[in-house]
Design a protein with these regions (language model features):
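A short, structured loop/turn motif at beta-sheet edges
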Residues: 90-95
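Short glycine-rich, low-complexity segments
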Residues: 1-89, 100-138
Length: 138
């Protein structure tokens, strides 16, 4: 399938990326039962899952046609800029909603914006995960 093609089996085309994004979303929501994960497959580090050090796995999404990173504009303190780093907030079939993150150069940490976008995963050719971090979501 090439970029922009329409296919009746679209959900199968984005399955691999959607599965990964669903796992990331699960981790970010800390939405698991501690009793169900006792072995190597537990999706957190440390002795108990209530110890929260990180709440975000920043991601980059790459265009399926060009390979270029997707980037979106955001405005903070009346300054408009662009970012190509995001936090997954929701996923529904082949569409995911992301929060735009930006790098605070003073602290060298990603911060969250109050700006979101929804993208069709059929338009995404690759996903890059960045190191886990804590984002203040309030």
């Amino acid at each position: 399938m090439s970029c922009g093609d329409v296919n009746q089996n679209q959900n199968q085309n984005c399955g691999c990326l959607a599965d990964i994004l669903k796992k990331i979303l699960l981790l970010q929501r800390q939405d698991y039962d501690n009793e169900n994960y006792k072995g190597c497959d537990k999706p957190y580090l440390g002795p108990i899952c209530s110890t929260i050090c990180y709440n975000t796995r920043p991601i980059m999404l790459f265009n399926c046609c060009t390979g270029a990173p997707w980037s979106f504009t955001y405005t903070i303190n009346n300054q408009t800029s662009t970012s190509d780093v995001f936090r997954i907030e929701a996923i529904d079939d082949c569409c995911c909603t992301c929060r735009i993150l930006y790098l605070d150069t003073a602290t060298n940490r990603y911060l969250g914006t109050s700006e979101f976008f929804t993208i069709n995963l059929d338009c995404v050719g690759a996903l890059r995960c960045l190191p886990d971090t804590f984002i203040d979501l309030c």
